[in-house]
Amino acid sequence: MALNEVVISDSTTLISLLNIERFELLFNFSTIIIISQAVYNEVCYQPHAKTTLDGYIADERVSVKVVKNNERLQQLLIRLDLGESESILLAKKENLPLIIDEKKGRGIAVELGVKTIGLIGILLIFKKKSLLSDNEIIEIVDALRNVDFRVSEALLKFLLE
C-alpha cells in the first residue's frame, strides 16, 4: 500500500529512476503520480523512458496535466525551467506534495507553501518503514550515482543511520 494517494512530481526523480530501471519504487510512495506536460516532455526525450512512462499512463498510475500559461508561470520561469515551474504551480493548485530534487526549485516551492520531498527523502521513508534494507539503499544510491544523480557521502551516511 502506498504512503500517499496522489503526488505531483518534477522530472529529475522520474528520469533517474527510469534510468536505473527502478521507477516502480515510486508506487510504494504514491498510488498515482501527476506530472505536467513539460515534465512529460522532459522525461520522454529517451525512447525507453517514453515507452515505460506511456505504459504507466495507460495503466492510470501516472497522469499528465496541462498547466495554463499565465502570469504566475511567467514569474517562475524567470528563476526556474518550465518543468519545475509547472510542477510547483500544479502542486500548489492541487494542494498536493511535490517530489522535487533541485535545491533552487524546492526552495521556491516551500516559499509558496508547497510540501516537498526529494528522492533521498523518499528512500529515507522507505528505510524507516522497512520497505528497503540498507543494502538495497546502497545499491540504489550506487546506481543513481552512475546516472549522475548527486548524493554526497554525508547524505548517504545520514540515510544509513
Residue ranges and their predicted role:
Residues L98, L112, S130-S133:
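Short capping loops/turns at secondary-structure boundaries
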Residues E21, G83, G118-G121, S130:
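Glycine-centered flexibility sites
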Residues G107, E111-I117:
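A short alpha->loop->secondary-structure connector
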Residues I120-E161:
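Hydrophobic alpha-helical interaction segments
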